[in-house]
Amino acid sequence: MMSESNKQQAVNKLTEIVANFTAMISTRMPDDVVDKLKQLKDAETSSMGKIIYHTMFDNMQKAIDLNRPACQDTGEIMFFVKVGSRFPLLGELQSILKQAVEEATVKAPLRHNAVEIFDEVNTGKNTGSGVPWVTWDIIPDNDDAEIEVYMAGGGCTLPGRSKVLMPSEGYEGVVKFVFENISTLAVNACPPVLVGVGIATSVETAAVLSRKAILRPIGSRHPNPKAAELELRLEEGLNRLGIGPQGLTGNSSVMGVHIESAARHPSTIGVAVSTGCWAHRRGTLLVHADLTFENLSHTRSAL
C-alpha cells in the first residue's frame, strides 16, 4: 500500500500525463483518421473536393507546427475508461480526470465549452456539473487503466438522434433511421463524418453504444458477421449520397460506419446515431500500475 505522500505524487504524475495527452489530441488527429482522410483525398475527383481535402491537411500540419488546436471547437471532454479493479489509483481517478481537463484547458489551450444548465454560465474551465463526462467499465483482476479521451464538438454532436422502434420495423427501420439522420443533418457536421450506430433496447443504451462506436479504430468491424455486413452496406449507401467534404458534394460522405449492439427486449429495437467530424479528435492512453503508459492512438506523436 502507498503512503499518503507517495500516493499524492502518483496522483500528480497521472494528472500531468492525462492533461498532456488531452492537450495533444486537440492538435493531432489519431493515426487512423489521418490515414482515412488521405485515402478519401486521393480518391476524390471533384475539383472543389480536392481543394477542401488539401485545406484540411494544410490545417492539420499548421496545428502541429503551431501547437494549436486543429479546430477552434475543442468540444466537451468525455472519458471512456476501462480500468482494472486492482489499478492503484482507481479511487482517485475521477478527480484526476477532472483536474487533468482543467490543466489541459490552459496548456492547449482549449476553448471553454462547459456551460452550467439553467444558470447559463460558462465555467471557463471545461469542467462543471457532470463534466467531464466519464463512462466506466471495471475489469476484474486487472491493474491497468485504458483511458479513451473524446472531444465532442458542437457541430458533430448536433446530428445525434435516438429512437425506439417497433420490432416489426426490423433492421430496415434501423437503416431508414440512419439514412434519414445522415442525409438531412450530416451536411452541417463538417463531413466526411464517422457514423456510430447503437442498437439495443432503449434510447439511453443505444445512445451510449453509438458514442462508443465512433471511438473504435476506423475500418474495424463488428464481431458478428451480419452486423459487419450491415456496417459495410451502410457505408456504401451513405457514400452514394455524395455529401462530400464540408457538405459541398464529392465522392464520399463518411469515413466509416461502426455498429455497437447489445441484446434487446423482444418488444423494442432501440437505435441511435452519433457522428464524428473530419477532425475526429479522440485518443487512447493505456496506463499501467507503475504509471508507465502507452499512446495507442497516436503512434506518430510523442507526449
From Swiss-Prot:
Q: Which reaction does it catalyse?
A: (2R,3R)-tartrate = oxaloacetate + H2O
PANTHER family referenced in this protein's UniProt entry, alphabetically: FUMARATE HYDRATASE-RELATED, L(+)-TARTRATE DEHYDRATASE SUBUNIT ALPHA
Question: Per the similarity annotation, which family is this?
Answer: Belongs to the class-I fumarase family.
Keywords associated with the record: 4Fe-4S, Iron, Iron-sulfur, Lyase, Metal-binding
Q: Does the keyword Lipid biosynthesis apply?
A: no
Q: What class of enzyme is it?
A: lyase
Q: What is its EC number?
A: 4.2.1.32
Record's GO cellular component, any one?
Answer: catalytic complex
Name the NCBIfam families for this protein: PRK08230.1, ttdA_fumA_fumB
What induces or represses this gene? Answer: Induced by tartrate, via TtdR.
Cofactor dependency: iron-sulfur cluster
**Known partners and oligomeric status:** Tetramer of two alpha and two beta subunits.
Q: Which GO BP terms sit in this record?
A: single-species biofilm formation; tartrate catabolic process; tartrate metabolic process; tricarboxylic acid cycle
Task: Check the record and name the InterPro entries matching this protein.
Answer: Class-I_Fumarase/Tartrate_DH, Fe-S_hydro-lyase_TtdA-typ_cat
Looking at the record's lineage, which domain of life comes first? Bacteria
Please report the name of this protein according to its UniProt entry: L(+)-tartrate dehydratase subunit alpha
